[in-house]
């Protein structure tokens, strides 16, 4: 199977919970209808998934061409390239949908990125603990 059930559940739960958090938080903070902030969250998630596939495809080609090892500097370069490209794609979307300037949208996007970093850490930690407690053989089974 190309994508394991475990990875699919992980991805859907990660994106679903994040979407709810973003929609509610942006709606509350900016006094915007949840339809707007929820739609923005969906658009950003879709862009992120496609950008992830495109960016990683080409990054791995460069990595292979120059025989890069996945060292910390290469990981930092990867993270900066990925997040930088994502910012370029999402800032205009945020500015348009939230009816704000590009500068304000950039600041909001940086803030969202930092919040998502914290969310990702918490989600991963919780997911690992839940999986270990209720599905102790899931990781090993997905490796086969």
Swiss-Prot record:
Membrane association type: Multi-pass membrane protein
One GO CC term on file: plasma membrane
Regulation: Protonation/deprotonation of Glu-15 may play an important role in transporter function. Cadaverin transport is inhibited in the presence of CCCP.
Consequence recorded when altering residue 15 to Q: Loss of activity. Mutant accumulates cadaverine. Retains affinity for chlorhexidine, but does not confer resistance to chlorhexidine. Favors the monomeric form at both low pH and high pH
Keyword S-adenosyl-L-methionine: no
Transmembrane segments: 9-29, 35-55, 76-96, 103-123
InterPro entries, alphabetized: BTP_bacteria
Protein's cellular compartments: Cell inner membrane
GO MF term set: antiporter activity
Keyword terms of this UniProt record: Antiport, Cell inner membrane, Cell membrane, Membrane, Stress response, Transmembrane, Transmembrane helix, Transport
Factors inducing expression: Transcriptionally regulated by the AceR regulator. Strongly induced by the short-chain diamines cadaverine and putrescine. Only moderately induced by the triamine spermidine and weakly induced by the tetraamine spermine. Expression is also induced by more than 10-fold in response to chlorhexidine exposure.
Function: Mediates the efflux of short-chain diamines when energized by an electrochemical gradient. Recognizes specifically the short-chain diamines cadaverine and putrescine as substrates, and promotes the active transport of these substrates in exchange for a cation. Protons are probably the primary source of energy for transport, however it was not possible to conclude with complete certainty that protons, rather than alternative cations such as Na(+) ions, are exchanged for substrates by AceI.
Record note on quaternary structure: Exists in a monomer-homodimer equilibrium. The dimer is probably the functional form of the protein, and the assembly of the dimer is mediated by binding of chlorhexidine and promoted by high pH conditions.
Record protein name field: Short-chain diamines transporter
Organism of derivation: Acinetobacter baumannii (strain ATCC 17978 / DSM 105126 / CIP 53.77 / LMG 1025 / NCDC KC755 / 5377)
